[in-house]
């Protein structure tokens, strides 16, 4: 949770203003997040991002940032994940999330992530990094075999991956 707070509080200043304190806090956020995913694993946002890196030479962090809103919408359909999103929103300054329905929680969190990405100049679609719809089947096949896939909170099929890539266009 602390890593998410630090990212929301410091990413724009670190990127746009080159504020050294914000840069240092982003380093701390990276460290904390790394400890977290070392313990619980990753999910399909990484499975999908690995394929964009391999096929289109997209930097991993950029691919994750572009894909995250789409994958959050997908994973948020799991009630336990929607509840976790609600808890995160309440912790990062949106206490009203406690009273929102699951779909509004998902929409709010996805919007916040998208706005944060836009605020630091991150492109919003995989088309912008060269992705082609005719490659989605191949990308999905590779994502199905990715070692991060089992860490996802929802089961995902090849068809789901294709649709998620399509939504990220």
Task: Annotate each predicted stretch with a short phrase.
Residues 1-40:
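Carboxylate- and glycine-rich phosphate/diphosphate-binding segment that chelates Mg2+/Mn2+
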Residues 23, 103-106, 158:
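Short, structured helix-loop boundary elements
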């Amino acid at each position: 949770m602390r890593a998410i707070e630090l990212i929301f509080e410091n990413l724009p200043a670190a990127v746009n203003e080159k504020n050294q304190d914000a840069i240092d806090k982003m380093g701390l956020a990276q460290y904390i997040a790394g400890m977290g995913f070392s313990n619980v694993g990753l999910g399909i946002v990484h499975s999908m991002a690995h394929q964009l890196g391999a096929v289109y030479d997209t930097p991993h962090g950029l691919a994750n940032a572009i894909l995250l809103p789409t994958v959050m919408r997908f994973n948020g359909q799991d009630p336990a994940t929607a509840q976790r999103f609600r808890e995160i929103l309440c912790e990062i300054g949106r206490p009203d999330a406690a009273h929102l329905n699951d779909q509004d929680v998902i929409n709010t969190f996805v919007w916040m992530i998208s706005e944060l990405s836009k605020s630091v100049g991150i492109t919003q679609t995989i088309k912008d990094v060269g992705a082609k719809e005719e490659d989605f089947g191949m990308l999905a096949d590779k994502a199905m075999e990715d070692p991060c896939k089992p860490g996802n909170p929802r089961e995902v099929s090849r068809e789901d991956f294709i649709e998620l890539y399509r939504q990220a266009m």
